[in-house]
Every structure is written in C-alpha cells, then in structure tokens.
Amino acid sequence: MKKKVMMSFLAIVLILIIAGVTIGKSLMDKYSYSKERADLETYFHVSGDRAAIVLQDEVIEEQALIRGGRCYFDLDTVHRYMNEIFYVDREENLLLYTDAVETISAQLADNDGTYNMTEGVQDLGYPVCLVEGDTIYLAADYVKQFTNYDYQMYDKRVQVYTEWGERMQAEIKSKTAVRVKGGIKSEILKDLQAGDTVELLEQMDNWSKVKTDDALIGYVENKRLGVIDAVQETPVTDYEAPAYTNIALDGKVSLGFHAIGAKIGNSTFYEMASEAKGMNVIAPTWFSLCDELGNFRSFGENSYVDTAHKAGLQVWGVLDNFNYRNETKTPVDEYVVLSSTSKRQKLVDGIVITAVNLGLDGINVDFEQVASETGVHYVQFLRELSVACRKSGLVLSVDNYVPFHYNEYYRLDIQGEILDYVIIMGYDEHWHGSGDPGSVASIDYVTNGIEKTVSMMESSKVINALPFYTIVWTTDGATVTDEYLTLNNTADFLKQMSTQPQWDEITCQNYLEWQSSAGLKQVWLEDADSIRVKLNVMSANEIGGVAVWRLGYGTDLVWELIRAYSAS
C-alpha cells in the first residue's frame, strides 16, 4: 500500500516537474530577447555590388553601385536628389556640367578618371562615370566636386545627406540592441552599449524608431534611452558655385519686337521706332535656325544697330526656330541640333560672334513649340548660351509661353537663374487657327502667367509681353474661322459696326458680338482699356518691364500708357 502511494506521489511530482519545465520554457520563449541577427542584404533588398541609399533618415527606392571600393549613383538619382545640372550626350560620348562660367566635360564611356575644365585637365584617380547598358553612373566624389552634399559608405548601405537642420539625439543608458521592428523577438540590426548615441526618429509608447551613427534604421526600447537632446547639424559647404552675374537695365525694360522678313525690312526702323514712346529696347527678328547643322540665317546690319544706338535704344537680336521654316517650307528639327553638343556649340558660337560683330547689346531667343523630348537639350543650350553671353557682355533674354503643367519642361525656374530676363508671351490664350473662340489675353490668363513666373524667380527679371492685336472669330455651325485685328485698325473697324462693344468684367476687355451672313462674329478687343488693366497687374507684381508684339500695330494712346508705366 505504501509503495503504491509512493509511486503515485512520484508520478505527480514528475508531472509537475515536466509541466513546470514546459511552462518555464514557454515563458522564457515568450519573454526572452531574440538573439537572431538580421541579414543586411535581405533587410535592404540588395545583392552583389548594390547598396541601399539612406537619404537623410529614409531608405529610398534607388540604390548605389559599389565598384572598386568606390561609390557611384545612377544619373537619375543624381538629378533627383543631388544636382540636376549634369548633362549627357550619348552620341558624342560626353558628360557635361555647365555652371555660370564654363562647361566641364568628361568622356562618358571608358572614362579614365580625367575631365576637362578651363584651367586644364583634372584627374579624379578613378573613372568619373560608368556606363552599363542604358544606365549611366556618376562617381559620388565627382558629383561632390560640384555639389554640397555628404555621403558615407557602410556595409550594404550608403548614408547621404543633402539637407541639414536640427535632429533629436538620444543617449543609450544600458546595453541593448537595435531591432528591425519594435519587439523583443525582432531580429537584431546592431548591438549598442551604454553611452552610445542614436538619432531619435519617432518616439512611441514602448519602442522608438532610431537611426544609428552608421545608418541603420530600427527600433530600441524606450527604457534603454537616456538623455534626449536637440543637436544642430553642420551643413556641407565645400563647393562654392560660381555666381550667375546678370545684366540689368536701369529701370524697366520697354521692348518692341520689330518683325523683319528680309534685309530691306531694316529700312523701316524709323517708321517703327517713331511710334514707340518710352521704348528703350528694340528687338529685330533677324536670326532664324535654317538647318540641322547649327546654322542660322541673318538679316542683321551694322547700320541698323548704329542708328538704334544713336536713338538711345539697345538692340537685342531675335533668334527663332520657326521663321525660316515657315518662309521656305524647309523642315528644320531643332531636336537634331540641340541634342548634339557639337551642333549646339556651333549655334552658340555663331550667334554670339554675329551679335558681337554687329554691335548688338543682347540676344533674344524665341524657340516656340519645342517638344517635351527636346526640353532637356533646350535647357542645356540656354545654359551654354548664357555662359557665352556672360563672357561677351551680352544681355540674354528668352521668350516663353505662359507657364502651365504641360510646358514645365521649358524650366522657367532654371531660366530665372541663368538668364538676364525672362519674357512671358502673355497672349495666345486662344490663338489663330485654334477653332476655339475666346480672348487672346484675358486678365486672369495674364495675371496667372505673371504670378506663376514671379514665384520661380526674381520679379525684376520678368517681362510681360502684350499683344497689339486680337482675333475676330466667325462661327458658322461647327466651322470656326478667324482673322487678326490690330490695335491701330480697331477704331476704323468699330466705325463699321452698328453695335458698340460692352466692357466684360471677366476678361477685362471690351467685347463685341453680332450676327452676320457668315455666322456669329465675336471679338474680345485689345485697346487702351484692356492694356491699362494689364499694366496695372504688371505694376502690382513689380516685374522688370514690358514687351509688345509688335511694332507697327500700336496707337499713340497705348504707347503713352506704356511710357507712363515704364517711367513709374
């Protein structure tokens, strides 16, 4: 009997021991800290010679290339986060960087580490760039030659800083680990000792998101954190970019475009200039791209410039991409010219030399209907032309459409930095041949164009161009036709009307419509009343001046308004 009791007792004890061990193990499993370490390739989603990029305090989608112990970033990454000035010409195997004073060039493929500057050939000591398939990589150190940013390489990751400010720093008060997620079972990224510091990214109830000094982002228990301080970061200022020096006229610019279709048109200077009260710049349409090699045709004459100077006027010769094409019906694709460094340079050199030889004061670029795929090459052309004009003491201005999202590739923000003046063509809201009757330049359209442009640059660089014309629209069923009406012909036009125009508060223009045998006629007039309102908006935005398209279309009253505006 005693033996049976003893056996039962031992069995119960054994069961309790087993249960205790099981429960203890379960409790240990539940409450003990995992010692599993994270695989960094898996954590960062990298393999081979790729490394994650930690930009500021965030792992971004783009990755770095580590080659020969050196760090490279692909061109898109450089453009997006560091410096968008780098330009590539694959056909001519060139990597270019154009600042305010020069263009630095390097061989693109098979680069030996050298690059060319005005002061001579420089050597980075290893390839400036690598080309792998369709992807171009730039050496991080080469980018730093022209950019204020910082980077540090670590195992499977590169820390990049492009911005600096105040960060929160926490001291570790006892031994712990940074884990992938907030939980004791999460894998370990790094062990920390008492006295180490981490950047505090986000503080939560029990765990906080932190970044270690070697760019690992994870979580630490709050109870392991000690003193938290605000630390001011020190910005990188190693690179000092050459200044974009600009030429500015004394007072407002008052520019008149002089439409010239042949050299004989230069003889109309006195006729055109005599009407223009207060004008201080005349811009003859002399130059037009004439082939796909970088050549242009010219109607320029020294005698015209001399005469203009004696009349107290500056002369800015206009270079366009459409007049020769329209006159001769010769197809000229500006993409072919602007995407080629050698052709682009030929155009830049040619127009600047011609301008200097003619004694011009400036160059005005009027490239219209530039395709989006040409945009990056057009901007590079303007960069290179701005350097050449700066060296030659020429004013550089560029004509632009009113800015909208669909023409952002004209890059008014960049133009505002590199140019002397940015001219907004404050018209063509509804244009000839559009089949869409409406105002050529309503006040909202003009105001939005000015305000958007001013938001991207110094207001003193902005010039708003006014139309000295409007359009008479005829709608017959689904058919819409139109014809131009100039300011100087408007009075005679209205004398023929049996009805008089009424002021439209929405467009701030005098509006007239009537029924004719041809259909419904509509016209939003440009006259002294509408021009006065536009000039008031220009004054309110304190822009750099006014331009008019074109000389020969104006009236004494409108020119008197412009003279008063320019003198204010």
List where the protein language model places each region:
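Hydrophobic faces of well-ordered beta-strands that scaffold small-molecule active sites
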Residues: 254-258, 280-284, 315-319, 363-365, ...
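SH3/SH3-like beta-barrel fold
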Residues: 195, 207-212, 220-221
